[in-house]
Curated annotation (Swiss-Prot):
Taxonomy, superkingdom: Eukaryota
Ranges for region Disordered: 1-30
Name of the protein described by the UniProt record: Long-chain-fatty-acid--CoA ligase ACSBG1
Record-level Gene Ontology MF annotations: ATP binding; long-chain fatty acid-CoA ligase activity; very long-chain fatty acid-CoA ligase activity
Residues with the Phosphoserine modification: 53, 56
Keyword Cell membrane attached: yes
UniProt GO cellular component terms: cytoplasm; cytoplasmic vesicle; cytosol; endoplasmic reticulum; plasma membrane
Compositionally skewed regions (Basic and acidic residues) per UniProt: 20-30
Tissue specificity annotation: Expressed primarily in brain. Expressed at lower level in testis and adrenal gland. Present in all regions of brain except pituitary.
PANTHER family xrefs: ACYL-COA SYNTHETASE BUBBLEGUM FAMILY MEMBER 1, LONG-CHAIN-FATTY-ACID--COA LIGASE
Taxonomic source organism: Homo sapiens (Human)
Coiled coil: none
EC primary class: ligase
Location of this chain's protein in the cell: Cytoplasm; Cytoplasmic vesicle; Microsome; Endoplasmic reticulum
Length: 724
């Protein structure tokens, strides 16, 4: 895809000055929105139809950065480090390690507009063709959306909830919400009506944006239970029929014409960096989800310094190109795709809604990103797909790939920081690996990130064998995303990187190996949980440190290694402390047929394990089918089984497969630190874990409490049979 295509969002010639007042028959709704926005601003401020340069844009909007921002002054009388009120303010954590003065989201965008106004900001597909929005157009659309929200009655510190897949509308609605003094609140598209109701009620949503009729139906079911909700806007599909207070995107954007630019500017001028602008709801694995309040300083600081720690570059040096596909309701995707994009003038291209069902690689090939982020499960799926293709390839091709990956992995493990590559490694890359990366869409990708969950060593080794280094980040919703980051200049295998500027860490209650609870401090730390004072006080101690509940250690160079979750730590009936993740990963490494493994044993006499097998996905629903993957069938054939489905293995209790799994677990037990770490019983489940099944969260993280409850009968049977 061209890097600097002139085709803008609603701007067929790439120049906003070319927009004509006549609506052509081919004009789309997006074209009309941009055109009418331009006309409205021009007629109010310009006497002639001059090109919309940076200077004329300033004149047209009659904008200036407020004096208090120009003078680097801001009002911060608050002393408390936390609040639970949406309209509350906090004392920002400015100290000698991060003395830079704070600024607002609007200032961040305004400065980006000055530098990157003519660059492509957003890319999206319409009728199988890529179209683009420049930063100037993006800013205008965000202002238009802000005025639309004000017209609909958005109150200060109330929310606009967005329920839809990643899109330009998601972006400029989010930015417009902040401009209008509201709070952006993402809702996962997989959420039930009840989950939507809880979040929309808790955040006092005045407006809810939905992308499809399916999502609209959820809101219509719960509208009567939402006293603050004034309107719903559907932006990808038309509503099934005309309904009161339900607007199409065109109608919503048209409402903005009735609000003067000066009214919006007055609101922008009053905004402070220590006010809430984003709400991120946790997945709620233990009760109702918590609303994580993030300030404007949280967002602008992390977008700038968190991304710098990952070597994300400003467009003056190299315009970063990224693909947006992970749920924007999650802070990792939102900070990486949306806010960091604005900070550095990146080009963000939107994947199709079925990205995780198989179309992501097609988008990657077309876009050719310069940096890419995926949760571990996404990288695992890419790995499994490559393995399946390799298994179906001819003998020579398969052997060439194995050879190339073997010599490359060895080089990357023995000399991880060296730019001097042996001839065999360079030859392997030229003949084989470069072609694989190109087929994946990673030919120009310099930085590949992962986070939100631990990654298996097998997956990291696999991609190192392809000459794709995966850079880890560590953080939480409560740290606005990354608090630690890896990069080409700060990398150590298996670590989560080093501290982001303006951040601090301490480990409490360390054991003999230096492992303790990770506690964090810095400009990334959240304001508090909305309406939850008790939970906020549990998370933030009297000195202002955030207690993460994660266990880890630091090496001599400051690299962080996560060892597990304190709450996930299994304490057996005999008093042994057993971290489950290393044992689960060891089982998956030993048995390539295993998709998910969950260790059980808290307050039990011995350890047991639930296993799921690798199976294919339904292309329409993305749910797991009964059919084994190519890799799983290859495992079966290798151990002497002809099984092609999970049900065959379970119903017939396939002796070859069960024996192979038993032997694999025996090998894991042999490498265990002590007998209490041995897995004594296990069972294969009929279906793999999934988001729709409830066992996985939106970022594919295992929801252990849900699994314990859902499979309680099987788990209890492990221990009922152990009679004294």
């Amino acid at each position: 895809m061209p890097r600097n295509s002139g085709a803008g969002y609603g701007c067929p010639h790439g120049d906003p000055s070319m927009l004509d007042s006549r609506e052509t028959p081919q004009e789309s709704r997006q074209d009309m929105i941009v055109r009418t926005t331009q006309e409205k601003l021009k007629t109010s401020s310009l006497t002639d139809r001059q090109p919309l340069s940076k200077e004329s844009l300033n004149h047209a909007l009659e904008l200036s950065v407020p004096e208090k921002v120009n003078n680097a002054q801001w009002d911060a009388p608050e002393e408390a480090l936390w609040t639970t009120r949406a309209d509350g303010r906090v004392r920002l954590r400015i100290d000698p390690s991060c003395p830079q003065l704070p600024y607002t989201v609007h200032r961040m965008f305004y400065e980006a507009l000055d530098k990157y106004g003519d660059l492509i900001a957003l890319g999206f597909k319409r009728q199988d063709k890529w179209e683009h929005i420049s930063y100037s157009q993006y800013y205008l659309l965000a202002r238009r959306a802000a005025k639309g929200f004000l017209k609909l009655g958005l109150k200060q510190a109330h929310s606009v909830a967005i329920l839809g897949f990643n899109s330009p509308e998601w972006f400029f609605s989010a930015v417009g919400t902040v401009f209008a003094g509201g709070i952006v609140t993402g809702i996962y598209t997989t959420s039930s009506p009840e989950a939507c109701q809880y979040i929309a009620y808790d955040c006092c949503a005045n407006v809810i944006m939905v992308d499809t009729q399916k999502q609209l139906e959820k809101i219509l079911k719960i509208w009567k239970q939402l006293p603050h909700l004034k309107a719903v806007v559907i932006y990808k599909e038309p509503p099934p029929n005309k309904m009161a207070n339900v607007y199409t995107m065109e109608e919503f954007m048209e409402l903005g014409n009735e609000v003067p630019e000066e009214a919006l500017d007055a609101i922008i001028d009053t905004q402070q960096p220590n006010q809430c602008c984003v709400l991120v709801y946790t997945s709620g694995t233990t009760g109702n989800p918590k609303g994580v309040m993030l300030s404007q300083d949280n967002i602008t600081w992390t977008a700038r310094y968190g991304s710098q720690a990952g070597d994300i570059r400003p467009a003056e040096v190299q315009q970063e190109v990224v693909v947006s596909y992970l749920p924007l309701s999650h802070i990792a995707a939102q900070i990486y795709d949306l806010w960091t994009g604005i900070q550095w003038g990146a080009q963000v291209c939107f994947a199709e809604p079925d990205a995780l069902k198989g179309s992501l690689v097609n988008t990657l090939r077309e876009v050719e990103p310069t940096s890419h982020m995926g949760v571990p499960r996404v990288w695992e799926k890419i790995m499994e797909r490559i393995q399946e293709v390799a298994a179906q390839s001819g003998f020579i091709r398969r052997k060439m790939l194995l050879w190339a990956m073997s010599v490359t992995l060895e080089q990357n493990l023995t000399c991880p920081g060296s730019d001097l590559k042996p001839f065999t490694t360079r030859l392997a890359d030229y003949l084989v690996l470069a072609k694989v990366r190109q087929a994946l869409g990673f030919a120009k990708c310099q930085k590949n990130f992962y986070g939100a969950a631990p990654m298996m060593a097998e997956t990291q080794h696999f991609f190192l064998g392809l000459n794709i280094r995966l850079y880890a980040g560590y953080g939480l919703s409560e740290t606005s995303g990354p608090h630690f980051m890896s990069s080409p200049y700060n990398y150590r295998l298996y670590s989560s990187g080093k501290l982001v500027p303006g951040c601090r860490v301490k480990l409490v209650n360390q054991d003999a190996e230096g492992i303790g609870e990770i506690c964090l401090w810095g400009r990334t730390i959240f304001m508090g949980y909305l309406n939850m004072e008790d939970k906020t006080c549990e998370a933030i101690d009297e000195e202002g440190w955030l207690h993460t509940g994660d266990a880890g250690r630091l090496d001599a160079d400051g690299f962080l290694y996560i060892t597990g979750r304190l709450k996930e730590l299994i304490i057996t009936a005999g008093g042994e402390n057993v971290p489950p993740v290393p044992i689960e990963e060891a089982v998956k490494m030993e048995l390539p047929i295993i998709s998910n493994a969950m260790l059980i044993g808290d307050q039990r006499k011995f350890l047991s394990m639930l296993l799921t097998l690798k199976c294919t996905l339904d292309p329409d629903t993305s749910d797991q089918t009964d059919n084994l993957t190519e890799q799983a069938m290859e495992f079966c054939q290798r151990v002497g089984s002809r099984a092609t489905t999970v049900s065959e293995i379970i119903e017939k209790k396939d002796e070859a497969v069960y024996q192979a799994i038993e032997e694999g677990i025996r090998r894991v037990n042999m490498n265990a630190a002590a007998r209490p770490y041995h897995i004594q019983k296990w069972a294969i489940l009929e279906r793999d874990f999934s988001i729709s099944g409830g066992e996985l969260g939106p970022t594919m993280k295992l929801k252990r409490l849900t699994v314990l409850e859902k499979y309680k009968g099987i788990i209890d049977s492990f221990y009922q049979e152990q009679k004294m």
